């Protein structure tokens, strides 16, 4: 993406997230969408991440070892006119777990505008 899309200082950061074991029926992290552009996530071999399917069912995300999970954020959804949709997700921590996340979004002072998508994406 061109610099004007994300500003001079895009808001990007990495976070190591620790989830303690939660009681049955409770979420370690409640259902939410990431607000930024996109998130790259490593689960480190312990499951618990779930994504909400269009039919309302929660799906366990069980990637192969070393795989990177890509979550679409609300800013990418807005910029593509809902072509890409933010992934509603949560964490059910049946055992202690760690994940590493890279969050990417625009400079907080940047005005966002819809992207001009090719007609084939309409």
Sequence positions of predicted segments:
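C-terminal flanking tails of non-heme Fe-dependent oxygenases
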Residues: 1-122
């Amino acid at each position: 993406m061109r610099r004007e899309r994300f500003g001079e200082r895009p808001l990007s950061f990495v976070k190591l997230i620790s989830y303690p074991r939660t009681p049955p029926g409770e979420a370690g992290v409640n259902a939410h969408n990431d607000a930024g552009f996109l998130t790259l996530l490593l689960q480190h071999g312990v499951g618990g991440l779930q994504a909400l399917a269009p039919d309302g069912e929660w799906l366990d995300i069980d990637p192969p070892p070393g795989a990177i999970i890509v979550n679409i954020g609300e800013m990418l959804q807005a910029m593509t006119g809902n072509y890409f949709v933010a992934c509603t997700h949560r964490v059910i921590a049946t055992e202690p777990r760690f994940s590493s996340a890279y969050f990417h979004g625009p400079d907080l002072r940047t005005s966002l505008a819809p992207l001009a998508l090719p007609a084939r994406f309409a």
